[in-house]
Amino acid sequence: MDRTTELLKVNKLNNSWEFCFKNFQDESKKYIVDKASIAINGISLTIANVSADSFSISVIPHTYENTNLKFINENDIVNIEFDYLARFSERSKN
């Protein structure tokens, strides 16, 4: 686990769910990139959208039904692991 963040909102869409999380306002923000991988509570997912204050993931029904995501509620704190390649790339710059 690298960090924790707050679930801001869950939107039920036609055939998926959109989970919107609070974005980081420090050096961790550099790892939150559109289409990058991110693990939330141990589940490897893809970041769908990023804004200054939040980032979101889209979840298909199979993932929703077979993971702990269906038990997460708005304002809950979740565990975050950043993409390994993003961390490696950042380290190699230094």
Task: Set out the residue ranges of the language-model regions.
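Conserved loop->alpha-helix
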Residues: 1-94
